[in-house]
Amino acid sequence: MTKISLNKLIAVASIVLTAGCGGSNSQSLNKEEKTSIPPKPPAISLFNASAKGDLDAVKQHIAAGTDLNQLDPNEQGSKDSCLGVAAAFGHKDVAIALIDAGADIGYRNKNGSSPLHIASFLCYPEITQALIDKGADRNARDNNGGTALDVMILPWDQVKGVYDFINGLIYKPLGVPLDYERIKSTRSEIVKILRS
C-alpha cells in the first residue's frame, strides 16, 4: 500500500468514526429514549414486599409505576395499605420510600387507622416523623374516635391488652413477636413527635 493510500484510508476511517460518534448518535439515543420500555415490576406483589421489608422489590415497583396504594388482598385482613403494613412491621426504609414516592399517607384501614396511627402505636419514631414531615393529619381519628396522640398518652397498663391482642393475632404467629420493652421505652418519644 502506498503512503498516500494509507493516509486516505486513515482519513476515511477517521471520518467514519467521527460520524459514528457525532450528531447521528444523539439522534439514535433520543430514539432509544422514546422507545424504551419501562422497567417491569418484580414477581412479588408490592403489598407482600412492603410486609416483608423488601426494599429492593419496593423500589422496583416504584420505578415500574405500580399503584402504591394497593390494599391487603386478604378478605379477613384489616385492608391496610402497603404503607400501613410497612409501618406495622417497622420497615422504616420501605415506609419512607413509599412516602417519598407519593403513597397515600391519609389512607384509613377498616379500623379507621391511618399509617400515622399504626406507626405511632407500634412506636416507630422514624416512620412517625416521616409521616408528619410529609403532612399526615395528626388529628385524624380512628373508628373509636381516637387520634394517634390520644392512644399514646394513655398509661401502659390501659393499652397493654391491645398490644397483647395484636401480638397474639398477628405478630407471634408470624414469628416476629412485639418487643414490649422497645415499645414501652419509645412511647414518650412518640408523644413528643406527635406534639411537636
Residue ranges with predicted function:
Residues D54-I62, H91-D100, Y124-I132, Q158-G168, ...:
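Ankyrin repeat structural motif
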Residues A19-G20:
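C-terminal motif of bacterial Sec signal peptides marking the signal peptidase cleavage site
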Residues P39-N48, L71-C82, R108-S114, R141-I153:
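Ankyrin-repeat boundary/"N-cap" motif
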Residues N48-G53, V85-H91, I118-Y124, V151-G161, ...:
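Ankyrin repeat A-helix N-terminal signature
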Residues G23-E32:
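Bacterial Sec signal peptide processing site at the extreme N-terminus
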Residues T2-I10:
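Bacterial N-terminal signal peptides that target proteins for export
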Residues R138-S196:
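Ankyrin repeat (ANK) tandem arrays and their immediately adjacent linkers/low-complexity segments
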